[in-house]
Amino acid sequence: MSAALRNYHARMQRVLDHIDRHLDDDLDLETVSGIAAFSKFHFHRQFTATFGLSVHRYVQLARMKRASYRLAYRDTQSVTEVAMDAGYDAPDAFARAFRQRFGQSPSSFRKAPDWEPWLAAFGPLEEARNKLMQRTFTADDVAIRNVPSMRVAIMEHRGDPATLGATVQRFIAWRKSAGLHPRTNPTFNVWRSERRPASPVDYSVDLCVGTDKPIEANGEQIRVGEIPGGRCAVLRVIGNTDNLEVPALYLYHTGLPSSGEEARDFPLYCQRLAFFPEVPEHEAIAELFLPLK
């Protein structure tokens, strides 16, 4: 890649970062073109040529994604407040747009989200982000740590990854009822299958929260387990952490062979340290742990 193209991409990346940080602000063409230091007369076409979406469409999808996360996973805001934060002047307009995109009203989505239309609706946003957000890693990004064992409460997800959102929603509701807040009790995902198994029903991941308290299931299927201590190769990922396959493959393809280390008999897992939508999506943080012998 030429220096000129790297500079061009960096200017476009500044725009995406600004949008993520300022979803509550007026993100008109003049504002966002100024962030990249491009002419407003050309920027709309430059943005579309780079990302495959117009600026307006990109902002609309980013706001709607945050709104849908708040509806499904957070209950501190009313539907009206979520609508206003998404840039709508009236709840009815938000409800119409939401139903058109996801086939559900906001209230219905909050109670029982249908995740397949949701995943399809945000495909263009994820594709746009991936144009410039392909992260590259080096050996210096990987640290070897001695990790202590961690007692965890586990909610298992077994089955199609398209329904994972429903399990996450139940997990969040359960940990809240159990008083296990993310600020005081660490959050882990343990992957027990590949990301895209040949049959979707074979997908398997454990949603975990660290705790030394007695576990109250509160009507959910919760079991107690342990993430074993030991040496781990650790890779920190900052940004969109919905899909951690690229950094995971870096650990296996480059980090593991070049180090001479061997993987231990426990699955790859991650700890989630900063969560969207509490932070802008590009500021979310997760750490991948590859257990070593």
Positions of the model-derived regions?
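A solvent-exposed interaction/effector surface
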Residues: 46, 57, 65, 69-73, ...
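Short amphipathic alpha-helical segments enriched in leucine
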Residues: 17-20, 37, 172, 176
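Charged, low-complexity surface patches
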Residues: 8, 36, 87, 164, ...
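Intrinsic disorder/low-complexity signature
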Residues: 15-17, 39, 186
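A short, Lys/Arg-enriched amphipathic alpha-helix from helix-turn-helix/homeodomain DNA-binding modules
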Residues: 2-27, 60-77
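Short, flexible segments with low predicted structural confidence
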Residues: 3-5, 14-15, 30, 53-55, ...
